[in-house]
């Protein structure tokens, strides 16, 4: 998302080879690349750095074994499907997806900020973490899980986060999330925690 957010005019701190000391960049291509799981991309700052990735086994019973990756030989179908997904999306598709995700994230962030007892941690773009100083945030997580929201609990500080994806940009999803989250807060405030 970061390169597309930058192209869309969002203020993004440098994160790539423009930063001194960055020697490689890896990206899983399934979540925001819209490819099948099982593919990733790794970029090296130079060819000299890439040579350290090669895997060699000199004691293999079949003879000398060399591979560009530790995983060895793999079917090409995953790579082909990743390539097809990226070609299909194109720059225009990725920009549009990023725009939708970032706009949805802003709406969700604003909605969370309007709920008493919750506050946003940091200044997120699309991975939004929220916490509470007055109620048990993990009970909020439990309530939201029962409503079929896929959120993650964090600690230090105790918080919950949602990673906004293209699925969240569909009509009505933002409103449903904020409604369920509001109900979760009301429930936790009214219903005492079970002992045990």
Could you say what each language-model-derived stretch is?
Residues 55-59, 71-75, 159-162, 193-195:
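Short C-terminal domain-edge/linker segments immediately following a structured domain
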Residues 13-15, 28-30, 68-71, 115-119, ...:
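Generic recognition of flexible, low-complexity loop/linker segments
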Residues 92-98, 105-107, 114, 122-125, ...:
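Non-catalytic terminal extensions of PLP-dependent enzymes
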Residues 1-70:
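Conserved PLP-enzyme active-site core in the AAT-like
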Residues 28-30, 44-47, 85, 131-133, ...:
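Structured loops at beta-to-helix junctions and adjacent beta-edge loops in soluble globular domains
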Residues 34-49, 74-75, 161-170, 196:
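Short secondary-structure transition/capping segments
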Residues 32-33, 38-43, 61-129, 158:
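Structural motif of enzymes handling amino- and sulfur-group chemistry
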């Amino acid at each position: 998302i970061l390169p597309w957010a930058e192209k869309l005019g969002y203020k993004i701190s440098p994160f790539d080879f423009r930063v001194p000391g960055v020697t490689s960049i890896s990206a899983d291509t399934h979540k925001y690349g819209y490819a099948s799981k099982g593919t990733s991309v790794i970029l090296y700052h130079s060819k000299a750095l890439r040579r350290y990735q090669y895997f060699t086994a000199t004691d293999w019973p079949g003879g000398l074994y060399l591979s560009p990756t530790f995983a060895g030989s793999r079917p090409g179908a995953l790579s082909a499907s990743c390539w097809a997904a990226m070609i299909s999306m194109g720059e225009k598709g990725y920009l549009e997806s990023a725009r939708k995700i970032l706009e949805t994230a802003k709406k969700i962030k604003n909605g969370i900020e309007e709920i008493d007892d919750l506050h946003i941690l940091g200044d997120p773009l699309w991975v939004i973490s929220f916490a509470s100083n007055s109620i048990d945030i993990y009970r909020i997580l439990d309530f939201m899980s029962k409503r079929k929201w896929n959120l993650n609990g964090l600690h230090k500080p105790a918080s919950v986060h949602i990673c906004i994806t293209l699925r969240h940009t569909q009509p009505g999803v933002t409103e449903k999330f904020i409604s369920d989250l509001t109900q979760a807060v009301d429930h936790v405030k009214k219903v005492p925690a079970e002992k045990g």
